[in-house]
Amino acid sequence: MAKNSIRVRYAPSPTGHLHIGNARTAIFNYLFARHNKGKFIIRIEDTDTKRNIEDGERSQLENLKWLGLDWDEGPDVGGDYGPYRQSERRDIYTPLIQQLLDEGKAYESYRTEEELQADREAQKARKEMPHYEYEYAGMSEEEKQAAIDEAKAKGLKPVIRFRVPKDEVFAWDDMVKGHVSFNSDTIGGDFVIAKRDGMPTYNFAVVVDDHKMAISHVFRGDDHVANTPKQLMIYQAFGWEAPKFGHMSLIISKDTGKKLSKRDESVLQFIEQYRSLGYLPEAMFNFILLLGWSPVGEEEIFNKKQFIKMYDETRLSSSPATFDSDKLEWLNNRYVKDADDSTIMDLALKQLIKAGNMPANPDAKTIEWARQLINLYKRQMSYMAQINDMASVFFEEPEQVSGEAFDEINNDTAPVVLKEFAAQIEALDLFDSVEIFKVIKSVQAKTGIKGRQLWMPIRIAVTHEMHGPELPESIELVGRETALEHIHQTLAQLKG
């Protein structure tokens, strides 16, 4: 197949926000298209009207754009193969469903939900796999028609079921998993292709859409493997050529070793959550791509252009991918360190404002102070929201020094250092990091105390923390008045 005939799609359902797993599907399809100079299409699969949420589509597209993805066709940009929402394509589906009915490849089914549930319970009691039992089994055409007429007289509306071929093998060479095959007798019987309201089900609509939109390759999650034989049956029924399929491995939790579940609230799983915490989109793109795909060599950090150039679908792994939030934090920290100061300033300032640690409309003096603060913590932050906890000493009145920190300075030399340091910074004409550094050296010279016994009492007294960024810069941002107040409080505590 020529590269320019490659067409792939990401087809989200607006039943929720963009999940890590779905973002991975979008990224893999995007890179495959861009690497091969093909087309990347967005299609909204909104046939599940009961579960669609109000801002589902907007949120999906907005977060894809935030990750750095763009598309050639879609509901917002149009294209030659529209409409790009399934809810707007019923005029395409309806005659095709009727065609299958006319050809005897599908039929009306009036079995109620209660009857189907009773069937499932009986099958369970017999230790059988749940499956649809043909409701017209053993009936003559006259008896079948009588049953249909009776159902209609009761006001029942039918679903449309696809007539599954008996004992036939449906197979494909999966681009990730290798050769996969299913016997038609194992898929659960005749399946629904149109609901009672006439809306097509996923398995029918996706086949029609992929065919009509000339989709050449389908990359999707491993949970769609069981759908593939059903879709191949529909392709066969229409005499259409199926696209090539690639089913990506499951994503499992590092902590549980089990499939990442949307119900597991201990793990952040939605792109919007990471945006809200101030993660960088480039880092998220990089991290998500490594969930089931690996570049050649040891290096794992590249920009999007490099990933497009090197992308090779044969390096997709069939083994489960482990979601490791610690690795994500490490990776994002690498990107934070390399990001330009203005980007980090903008993102971190938003976090400070959101937490109430900065006014919504700070003046120039406050912004300059914030700039110094953010630069001070930039290399330590894994994501921007951490600035509020890391720099809490600048926003909250600290409690008394306690625990390990108090034990560290509860000695004879700490009061000597603190008294001398307080006296010298109080006498400074210019209170900045350069002068503060000079004072620390002067205290060392005057007291003969050096190393940890010198700077640890100063850090703990001023910031109430044992660790942190550069000490002189931290003290400058705390301010002379507050620094002296903290030192005197600590001295009183040590006397106590």
Curated annotation (Swiss-Prot):
Give one Pfam family.
Anticodon_2
Q: Which family does it belong to?
A: Belongs to the class-I aminoacyl-tRNA synthetase family. Glutamate--tRNA ligase type 1 subfamily.
InterPro entries per the record? aa-tRNA-synth_I_cd-bd (IPR045462), aa-tRNA-synth_I_codon-bd_sub2 (IPR020751), aa-tRNA-synth_I_CS (IPR001412), aa_tRNA-synth_I_cd-bd_sf (IPR008925), Glu-tRNA-ligase_bac/mito (IPR004527), Glu/Gln-tRNA-synth (IPR000924), Glu/Gln-tRNA-synth_Ib_cat-dom (IPR020058), GluQ/Sye (IPR049940)
Official protein name in the record: Glutamate--tRNA ligase 2
UniProt xrefs under Gene3D superfamilies: 1.10.10.350, HUPs
Broad class of enzyme this protein falls into = ligase
The answer to whether keyword Cytoplasm applies is yes
Q: What is its EC number?
A: 6.1.1.17
Provide the binding site for ATP. Answer: 262
Q: Where is this motif: 'HIGH' region?
A: 12-22
A Gene Ontology biological process term: glutamyl-tRNA aminoacylation
GO CC term (a single one): cytosol
Subunit info?
Monomer.
Please give the function described in this protein's UniProt entry: Catalyzes the attachment of glutamate to tRNA(Glu) in a two-step reaction: glutamate is first activated by ATP to form Glu-AMP and then transferred to the acceptor end of tRNA(Glu).
What gene is this protein a product of? gltX2
Q: Where in the cell is it found?
A: Cytoplasm
Instruction: Kindly state the positions of the motif 'KMSKS' region in this protein.
Output: 259-263
A GO molecular-function term, please? glutamate-tRNA ligase activity
Recite the UniProt keywords alphabetically: Aminoacyl-tRNA synthetase, ATP-binding, Cytoplasm, Ligase, Nucleotide-binding, Protein biosynthesis
Give the catalytic activity.
Answer: tRNA(Glu) + L-glutamate + ATP = L-glutamyl-tRNA(Glu) + AMP + diphosphate
Q: Which domain of life is it from?
A: Bacteria
